[in-house]
Every structure is written in structure tokens, then in C-alpha cells.
Design a protein with these regions (language model features):
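A flexible loop/linker signature enriched in serine peptidases of the S9 family
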Residues: 52-65, 79-86, 98-112, 126-132, ...
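Non-catalytic accessory segments flanking enzyme active sites
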Residues: 40, 144-147, 172-176, 181-194, ...
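Cap/lid segment of the alpha/beta-hydrolase catalytic domain
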Residues: 235-236, 394, 402-524, 531, ...
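Residue-level detector of Asp-centered blade-edge/turn motifs that repeat once per structural unit
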Residues: 43-44, 92-93, 138-139, 223-224, ...
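Active-site-proximal cap/loop segments of hydrolase catalytic domains
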Residues: 466, 479-677
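Hydrophobic beta-strand positions that form the internal "hydrophobic ladder"
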Residues: 45-48, 94-98, 143-144, 225-228, ...
Length: 677
């Protein structure tokens, strides 16, 4: 053997030994994670400011600071710290950054400006409610934003109050609105989100819009700075008939609103080019469960759909001179592309995302400036980092490695793509397998089928702390995009329109069969879990097969009638998921309810829900748990205090969710929880 060959062999052996010495991820590593969000590139394209998020073990919250980094990867340094800063936005001169900051002990954020040359930070406005949708005027003298303006509800009755010093019970809450609570936000107070402008030098903000209607999203300035374009649904029956917003031009001097669009469907996300052309997103409302979001441009009075042949949802249009940068999901991967001035689509980059830490959903964001795009980049082995790419498609560079210090000390599970053929109709079903660290193809491993929610959503080759922790415990993890998933076209998504659950069950079972065909999955140790829409499908699965050793049903819908009459999104569900109301067609609701099949369940099943969940209300989980107990099925009920639908939105929630799921599976033959500690 030559000296060179010997050296290569020694390096390979040393690397393998080093990998074996690194332990897998553990539950407390949740609190070690960091990720980037909201990268904003300077007008000259040379510097990116972004929010650096950390999962704080002391406060059990996601906290963030603003950092900057040059487009060549140098000069990585903090800009604003200690105030949970968010939403950085460059001034047109590139010398100032507006952002939101939270004072110690306060829930709401205030609008601030950082002067980069001097390092001075000044408050622009301290507001009674948190601002959003920050947008600088083209000349840098004003900032537009939206915020909630309280209204006054007319009292139902005028009643005597308590005498001075008396302690009476709290007054009843009187509700006379259609939308009266929102998951994670509590009861909806009287009032609406309105549009404001304020001088960039500070002062009193000026309210431009009024009335009982919300202004949505981020406003867009016209090039002359005289007007803003916003999205708003200003119909009187908007609460009872969602999904029909229009674009409006708002005169900055007078507040006069002029409607720009008029059709059945949502028009939103306006972006205005240098010549005043408006790019925006829109969808034609056909009352389908899944409706594509398309790109339109409006030049003067005429609006035209761009890329009519592209069968994918488009997101977040942003101008780069006379071209438009967009993002879209394609087969589980989020891509960045340029719509050229000839109406063609040119690819820039892929793997945008990484801000959904728990499960491998899409997400992330990008910004455009100085001939470059800054975006959040993800992969199966890391959450969101900051990356840049040139508008011409060159110069792709990952700028940060926020978790390098952690992942150099841990061994992650490797991810491979898998396809299955559905037993329902032969359609191809896309999925991914996460293999345990130290994987040995000659062994047989237990498998966890993890099902995404939505149901109109998608998983992909993105970082997932939950999947990695299951793999760290010794499981092969299978996650898939059954019919109904987005990023495969409108027809594929609408295969479950008015038919969910249904043949998506067959897609999932065929994917499990494909995983078994890999040769390293133990057919006697199969487990299943999913949340929200995935919880619906998990409950449906155990009502139709006994092939799984145990199941965890997280925040499910169990009875579609009771869900429609208790959930915060009931109006949306009635319009887009069913043709008639429950009392008009009760069978349509019951035949799709997992509760209808609970009498066939034999699989040990744990139910998991947040006690403040109003998206899939806790009463759904209560029904299922009590039905399981009445049927004598081994079962447990885990209720998370203070948690809404986002059980894992707080770091401890993510850690505990995984811990309880692993403990339940361990009870029924899965690997010991200690393997993931």
C-alpha cells in the first residue's frame, strides 16, 4: 500500500470514529438551536440585516437580535440586542434601518430607527398597539405601517356597577360578531387594523384609513411617494364570506381610497415597480379546498396574469428593476425564481425555508436589492441560515452557519427521498426517510410515520428537529406528501376536496409499504403520529387498520359537525370544505369524521392537545379520548396548559411533545426514551 493510500485510509477511519463518538441530538438540544429569519438586503446589495433567533431556556420563548453580515460573508456582527428586535427594513439611502423593539416586560413592540454611521437609536413612535407592515417612502422621509385601532362596542345592557371598594365577579363577555376569537390571540376586541404614516424623524403618526375593515399585509408605495397600495376586504359581509379582498390606492395626503381590482377572489401582496407597474398575488374563488395563488401585473387600468401555465402557488413578489422575483413550492422544495420582462421563469435557487423548526414545513423569506437576493436557506441538516444569490443566478453563497457549533458535536440522521405508488389509483406519492444516526442497513429498525397538517400543506427535504429526535431515539422516520398536499399542482391538491379523509389514507399506507421494501424497517414495530390535519389522518388510520403498534393523535378534528360549530375558523370551513351546513346534510360531516370509526380502534392511542386550542378545539380531543376509554382501548390524554394550536410554539412545548410521543411508543415496544436524552 502506498503512503498516500495509507494516509487516505487513516483519515477515513478517523472520520468514522469521530462520527461514532458524537452523540445524537437530545431533548435539551432544542434550547441550543438558532435560526435566521427576515433577511433584508441593503439597497446596494452589499450588506444583509437579519433577525437571529434563539430558543431561550430561561424564558422558554423564541428571542431575537438583529445582526448584519456582508454579502461576501465578512463582518458578521450584532446590530441591535436585548430588545427582542424584529422586522428590520432598510431606508432607501442604506444609512438607516427601521425595526420593531420590545421594552422589558412589555408584550407590544415599538417602531425604532438605527443610524448606522453614528450607532444612534431613536424611537419613531410609541404606539398603543404593535405596528406591522413597515414600509419606507421612496425618498426616505416617511414610514408607512399598519396597527390595530381599538373600537367601541355598543353595550347590550346598561347595568349598575359595584360600589366603591366592592369585589364583584368579572362582568360577562358579550359577543355579537361572527369572528370573535382567534387561535393564539384570544378573544377579538372591537376595532380594526388601519393604515398610518409617520415622519422618519419621529412625531405623531397620521391615520389614513378608517371604518370597520382591516388593512392586510404590507403597504406598497408608489414611486412618486404620493400614494400607497394596500389589500383590504371592505365588504359588509366579509366575516361571513371570506376570501374576496381587493387592492386599493390610498392617497397619502387625503386618505382617499380608490379600488384597483374587482373580481371574485383574494388580491393581495402588492409590489410596485420603478415605472409604477403593480405586481400582486390573486386567486379566483371557486369554493375549492385548494385554489392556486397566481401572479398578476397591472399597468394602468389593465391587469394580466403572468405564467398562466405554471401549476404552482406563487409567493411574495418583489421587483428587481424590470423583473420580478418570486418564491414557490415545487414537490416539497421551495424555489426562488425570476419572472423576466419576457414573461419567462428563470430559476435562481432552491431550499428557501428553515424557519419552521419542529417539522419540515416550508416558510422563510427573501428580499431584493443591488442586483442580489438575500434569503433563508435550509437543508435536512440545518435550519434557516442567511444566503445570497445574484439576480443573474450566479454567486450563490451561504453566509452563516448558526448551528455549526452544536452540530459539530452531534450526529444527525441522514435523509433520503422515497416514492411510492398509491394502492388507490397508482398515483406517485412523494416522501422522505430519516435514518437513525449510526445507521446499519443490515439491522431492522422501528418506524414512525409522521403526517403533516393543513391538510393543504407540504413537507420536504428541510430541517426538522422533531424528526431528528425520533431518529436519535432509534427510529426510521417516514414523512410524505399524500394527495391534498400542495406543491404538486392544483388537481393533486383537490383530490381531497370534499373527500378528506379518504384516499390519502391509501397513499400513506402505500408509503409505509414502500418503506418496508427498503429492507431495514421492522414490520412489527410501526408507529404513527401527526398533528392537526395529520391528527385527523392518524385517528382515521387507527380506525381502519391495526398494523401500528401505537399512535399519537395530536390536536385533531374528530367530529366535523362539532368542529364547525366550535372552531375559530368555522366560516372558512363551512365555505371551502363542505357544500352544505351540518343540519342540512349531516351524513356529509359524519362519514368523514374519525369518530364514526372509533369502534374499530384497537391500537393504543395517546391524544395530545393544547388547552387553549380553538383551531381544533380541545373538545375534539376530549370526545376522542372519552370514546377510546368507552371502547376499552389503551389510551392516554396529554393536555398542554396555556398552549394554543401551536403546541410546539414555545421551546419546552416542542421538547415535551417529542418526549411524550417517544414515551408512549416506548411503552408499546419502541426504543427507550433514554436514547434521545
Amino acid at each position: 500500500m502506498s503512503l498516500r493510500s495509507l494516509l487516505v485510509l487513516l483519515v477515513v477511519v478517523a472520520s468514522a470514529a469521530s462520527a461514532q463518538e458524537r452523540p445524537p441530538l437530545g431533548l435539551m438540544d432544542v434550547f441550543e438551536l438558532e435560526y435566521a429569519s427576515d433577511p433584508q438586503i441593503a439597497p446596494d446589495g452589499e450588506t444583509v440585516v437579519y433577525r437571529r433567533n434563539r430558543l431561550d431556556v430561561r424564558t422558554d420563548r423564541v428571542r431575537g437580535d438583529l445582526w448584519t453580515i456582508h454579502a461576501d460573508g465578512s463582518g458578521h456582527q450584532p446590530l441591535v440586542t436585548g430588545v427582542d428586535a424584529a422586522s428590520p427594513r432598510w431606508a432607501p439611502d442604506g444609512l438607516r434601518v427601521a425595526y420593531l423593539a420590545r421594552d422589558e416586560g412589555e408584550d407590544r413592540r415599538h417602531l425604532m430607527i438605527r443610524y448606522l454611521e453614528t450607532g444612534a437609536t431613536v424611537p419613531v413612535a410609541r404606539l398603543p398597539s404593535a405596528p406591522g407592515g413597515i414600509a419606507w417612502s421612496p425618498d426616505g422621509t416617511q414610514i408607512a405601517f399598519t396597527r390595530f385601532v381599538e373600537g367601541q362596542a355598543e353595550p347590550l345592557a346598561s347595568l349598575p356597577g359595584p360600589p366603591e371598594g366592592a369585589e364583584w365577579a368579572a362582568a360577562p363577555r358579550v359577543i355579537e360578531t361572527t369572528i370573535y376569537r382567534r387561535d393564539g390571540g384570544g378573544y377579538v376586541e372591537p376595532g380594526h387594523r388601519q393604515l398610518f404614516v409617520v415622519s422618519a424623524e419621529g412625531g405623531t403618526p397620521r391615520q389614513l384609513t378608517v371604518g370597520p375593515h382591516d388593512v392586510d399585509g404590507t403597504p406598497a408605495w408608489t414611486p412618486d411617494g404620493r400614494a400607497l397600495v394596500v389589500s383590504s376586504d371592505r365588504r359588509e359581509d366579509a366575516d361571513l364570506d371570506p376570501g374576496d379582498s381587493e387592492l386599493y390606492r390610498v392617497d397619502v395626503a387625503t386618505g382617499t381610497m380608490t379600488v384597483l381590482t374587482d373580481r371574485r377572489g383574494a388580491d393581495a401582496s402588492p409590489a410596485i415597480g420603478p415605472d409604477g407597474t403593480i405586481a400582486y398575488l390573486g386567486s379566483d374563488d371557486r369554493r375549492l379546498g385548494y385554489q392556486l395563488t397566481n401572479l398578476y401585473v397591472r399597468d394602468g387600468e389593465a391587469a394580466e396574469r403572468v405564467l398562466p401555465a405554471l401549476d404552482r402557488d406563487l409567493q411574495d413578489p418583489a421587483w428587481a428593476d424590470d423583473e420580478i422575483v418570486v418564491a414557490y413550492d415545487d414537490q416539497g422544495t421551495t424555489r426562488l425564481a425570476v419572472v423576466t420582462d419576457r414573461g419567462e421563469l428563470r430559476q435562481l435557487a432552491e431550499n428557501l425555508g428553515g424557519t419552521s423548526i419542529g417539522r419540515p414545513y416550508g416558510g422563510g423569506s427573501f428580499s431584493v436589492g443591488g442586483g442580489r437576493v438575500a434569503f433563508t436557506l435550509t437543508a435536512p441538516d440545518h435550519p434557516a441560515d442567511v444566503a445570497v444569490v445574484d439576480i443573474d443566478g450566479g454567486g450563490l453563497r451561504r453566509l452563516t452557519d448558526l448551528n455549526g457549533d452544536l452540530f459539530q458535536q452531534r450526529t444527525l440522521g441522514e435523509v433520503e427521498e422515497i416514492w411510492a405508488e398509491s394502492s388507490a389509483d397508482g398515483r406517485r406519492v412523494h416522501g422522505w426517510v430519516v435514518r437513525p444516526p449510526g445507521f446499519d442497513r443490515n439491522r431492522r429498525y422501528p418506524l414512525v410515520l409522521e403526517i403533516h397538517g393543513g391538510p393543504f400543506a407540504n413537507y420536504g427535504p428541510r430541517f426538522s428537529m422533531e424528526a431528528q429526535l425520533y431518529a436519535a431515539a432509534g427510529y426510521v422516520v417516514l414523512y410524505t406528501n399524500p394527495r391534498g398536499s400542495t406543491s404538486y399542482g392544483e388537481a393533486f391538491g383537490n383530490l381531497i376536496d370534499r373527500a378528506y379523509p379518504g384516499q390519502d389514507y391509501d397513499d400513506l399506507m402505500s408509503s409505509v409499504d414502500a418503506a418496508l421494501d427498503l429492507g431495514y424497517v421492522d414490520p412489527d414495530r410501526l408507529y404513527v403520529t401527526g398533528g392537526s390535519g395529520g391528527g385527523v389522518l392518524t385517528a382515521w388510520i387507527v380506525g381502519h387498520t391495526d398494523r401500528f403498534a401505537a399512535a399519537v393523535v395530536a390536536k385533531p378534528v374528530i367530529n366535523w359537525t362539532s368542529w364547525l360549530l366550535t372552531a375559530d375558523s368555522y366560516v372558512f370551513g363551512a365555505k371551502y370544505w363542505f357544500d352544505r351546513l351540518p343540519w342540512e346534510d349531516p351524513d356529509a360531516y359524519w362519514k368523514r369524521s374519525p369518530l364514526a370509526h372509533v369502534g374499530k380502534v384497537t391500537t393504543p392511542t395517546m391524544v395530545l392537545v393544547g388547552e387553549e386550542d380553538v383551531r381544533t378545539p380541545v373538545s375534539e380531543s376530549e370526545q376522542y379520548y372519552q370514546a377510546l376509554r368507552l371502547e376499552g382501548v389503551p389510551s392516554a390524554f396529554v393536555r398542554v396548559p396555556g398552549a394554543s394550536h401551536g403546541i410546539a410554539s414555545r421551546p419546552s412545548g416542542l421538547m415535551r411533545k417529542v418526549g411524550y410521543i417517544l414515551a408512549w411508543f416506548e411503552r408499546y415496544g419502541g426504543p427507550a426514551l433514554a436514547a434521545a436524552e
